[in-house]
């Protein structure tokens, strides 16, 4: 048995007699990589390099889409806005949400087309989790409590959120926050 054992020997980093058996990283290489890493990370602190991106909002004609008294928690209401063929969902979530309106900030509206490849999200609202999806194409789901951000799946963009306002008991859509799938810019086409 002892014939098959290969002795292991320690090789100091400065021992040049054994080429190819150096330590995995020399002091010089460590300092070079460390300095490069610090330099690259500090670039983000330069003025104008790292900027906060603001969500783009397209303003449209104000349109009544529902009433506070008619909404029931967890029961979505479908509507079209800003064009007749753009399908959306209005829902009272029962929990506060980003961009929510009403006394509890729990009423939100979102477009019903997946931002990945435009799959239809009609009828996929899950009230117990406040999510929309999964998309029938690639199973993306969206969290409606967090501005429609992707909860899972292939999409990389949040769902376009319909900007709402309340006047008395009436709920109005006044704009779109984000880009609806299939449009290169929501302001390119005039509402019908």
Curated annotation (Swiss-Prot):
Q: How is the cofactor bound?
A: Binds 1 [2Fe-2S] cluster per subunit.
Entry PTM: Predicted to be exported by the Tat system. The position of the signal peptide cleavage has not been experimentally proven.
In the record, which residues are listed under signal peptide? 1-52
Q: Which Pfam families match?
A: Rieske (PF00355)
Is Lyase tagged as a keyword? no
Q: Which GO terms describe its molecular function?
A: 2 iron, 2 sulfur cluster binding; metal ion binding; oxidoreductase activity
Instruction: Note the PROSITE patterns from the entry.
Output: RIESKE, TAT
Q: What is its main location?
A: periplasm
Its annotated compartments are: Periplasm
Q: How does it assemble?
A: The iodate reductase (Idr) complex is composed of a molybdopterin-dependent iodate reductase (IdrA and IdrB subunits) and two associated peroxidases (IdrP1 and IdrP2).
Kindly provide the name given to this protein in its UniProt entry.
Iodate reductase subunit IdrB
Recorded source organism is Pseudomonas sp. (strain SCT)
Query: Gene for this protein?
Result: idrB
